Amino acid sequence: MSWTTPKRAFIGAATAEGGTKLNAFDNALLKLGIGNVNLVKLSSVIPAHIEWMEKVHDVPIGMLLPTVYAHIESDEPGMTISAALGVGISKNNEGGLIYEYSGYCTKEEAEEMVRKMVEEGFRQRGWELGEFKVASAEITVKDKPAAAIAVVVMFPY
């Protein structure tokens, strides 16, 4: 297998319920258009000059997709769960960083956490932050297991 530097990326977030926690996770992936592919977990560096997509489309079933993701599942009624990804893009789009967080919290709390992580990551590298993107999802568990997921999916084309 050969890997190439990604050229495009999609950022998104979703929640879902399911018969089990894993089914809830799968249902959230389906909402994002990535439920029929194989996610390959990445660490958190964005290549230079990446183009951002509005949505995922025409992805072959079973494709290996490099993905940074945060997720949480729960079957505890009344619990609020959230997942967030913060994306920092450097000035002149020379690269960037993605940080992920999930927990028993509101999406605003998760968003604040990833913003702090992005800012620290840039500070540690001596990079100047040009743009910040965030994707987050929140759900309160009712009578079925629930999941929240936030993703950045990278595409070689």
From Swiss-Prot:
Pfam families attached to this UniProt entry: PvlArgDC (PF01862)
Marked site (Cleavage (non-hydrolytic)) residue numbers: 43-44
Keyword Lyase attributed: yes
Keywords recorded for this protein, A-Z: Decarboxylase, Lyase, Pyruvate
Cofactor note: Binds 1 pyruvoyl group covalently per subunit.
GO molecular-function term, one example from the UniProt record: arginine decarboxylase activity
Enzyme class: lyase
Reaction equations catalysed: L-arginine + H(+) = agmatine + CO2
Cofactor: pyruvate
Family annotation (SUPFAM superfamilies): Pyruvoyl-dependent histidine and arginine decarboxylases
BP-aspect Gene Ontology terms: arginine catabolic process
The EC number(s) this enzyme carries: 4.1.1.19
Domain of life: Archaea
Keyword Glycosyltransferase attached: no
Modified residues (Pyruvic acid (Ser)): 44
Family: Belongs to the PdaD family.
PANTHER family tied to this protein: PYRUVOYL-DEPENDENT ARGININE DECARBOXYLASE
HAMAP family in UniProt: PvlArgDC
Protein name: Pyruvoyl-dependent arginine decarboxylase
